[in-house]
């Protein structure tokens, strides 16, 4: 099995036709995907803020990096835009609800054909224009993301909503500028990008909520700790338009936009939602609302100036 199950639309050797049949059919067309249909801890979900339990003991998130910048490859998979980090400067996340260190493997973008849809998670039954998902695997217990995805406490996904505005988040601005995005217009095209700062994806201060869920693509393993950041990332309307011009197909095939690449929300059932601030009282400033990302740098000789 390939090391990284997120890397291809042809997950578990499924054909593109089967995958694109739609999320409602995933559990029916492939027995290996039955959790997509019968699972009780599926993602994404609608987040009802009145159901979030305030947990003042949730610690801040902690980012551990080797060096100041990262590099990686931006890829049009035919289904998603992903940024896959190289292995030279690993980035780990810990803290919050996480009991282990998790290594950042890749960043995935979801977006809609209109600004009123696009995110996978909903907040009080409202969608955002898109969602950025930072996908990490438990490096303390597992050797790679493929192994981790199948096992308990395997994955941690940090999610940030996308908002269309007049300005753009610096990290996303590098990913979505015209020179970069036009190089991945069609399926399987890729472009190498270097000198990006992961810290720029996180707001200066923020709150978060967390719950136990699943991957949002087949085989929908229920091994994910989700961490949803409460403050969105901005991109411009032109950058969103450029995303919608990305094709699911190759140049010789009929154009089909990659937009609306999100899974519908799934039932919450009896799962609990926790947050480091009281989402039920948006006007009240509590300790969690001022959390900042803690960053530790592990400088190696190759990163010294």
Name each region found by the language model.
Residues 1-305:
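Alpha-carbonic anhydrase
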